[in-house]
Amino acid sequence: MKFRFCIVLFLCWIVSSCATWYQRTAAFQDAVSKGEFEQAEKLLQKDKKQARDKNKILYYLNQGYVEFMLGHYEKSNQAFEIAEQLTEDQQRNLLTEAAVLISNPEIRPYRPEDFEVIMINFYKALNYLQLNNMEDALVEVRKINIRLQQLNDKYPDHKNRYQRDAFAQLLMGLIYDAAGDYNNAFIAYRNAYNTYQTDYLKNFGLAAPEQLKKDLLRTAYQSGLTQELAGYEKEFQQKYTPAPLPANGQLVFFWLNGFGPVKAEWGITFTKIDKGDGVIVFHNEELGLTFPFFWGNGYSENDRNSLANIDVVRVVFPKYVERPRPFTQGVISYDGKNYTLQMAEDINQIAFKTLHDHVEGIIQFAVAGRH
């Protein structure tokens, strides 16, 4: 099947950023919010210092996004490549996470959240599609699922709700579909549908789009999978009727709507209670949180003396502040027909839920790591 990919963006922003950085780059943020991307590009070029400081990942993510919006797809991918390499260079383990959470936000480097890392590959895939490079676009969407597996390995005892990306699987299906590989397209669509109906519906309140169901039926038919076709016809309560495809192909329309959330922070104050015999407890009365900590054997005398002099500990954690979407729905009108757009990915929901999972999983380690 011949597809034409159309990507329409209204104030779409992949980087959540942090509140202090957001305030310092007000002119850039204002230019982006007004759709003045040439001005935003000039502001980035003028402030090359950001490319070398602790927020250099943010700089290259912003550059990749702005170049994408300007239609400079190769330049966009060059910036995203640098951002991707920088994220891979950062250590990914619980000790580092704890240190990041409790250190001074003005000193620590910006560390992208998991969904932001995934969005790098998403935008690289879109760039390759715009360059009509289906093969490399497919590589990027495959990397999304591999990267999700790697990211989830960081939290073996507190698995994320964001373990599979349904939209990445859907995009993979579209690319296979465009290449005429209907069997692999069906497999990708099926994976996407299963992820929507399990992970996404349960965790993010998002069910499979109707168009995905239609594509699943069509590719099952085109692949000669009669049993699968019959099963999905029964499940969807709709009969598939083969129809000739338009000679000039079909339009795939993506609408990327809204800004990602802004990252701020919140803190919890713990009071130390010495239980004796090397056992202390960190307690927060307001939230009802209590974490026991043994500091006997294995700790030096200096460590024990330092801990003995501490009565109160404040641990700082990240949080998100949502920026509402400018539009709540969209409709395409063509040839006398209206097509209502359906949401396929809710970045806000993913951001809030996964951050909650991460903080819940490492809060105890962060309290202990403070010492």
Question: Where on the chain are the PLM-derived regions?
Answer:
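Boundary/linker segments of alpha-helical solenoid repeat arrays
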Residues: 52-56, 87-97, 149-157, 193-230
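Bacterial Sec signal peptide processing site at the extreme N-terminus
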Residues: 15-37, 48
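"A position-specific structural signal for the A-helix of alpha-solenoid helical repeats
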Residues: 26, 62, 66-69, 116-119, ...
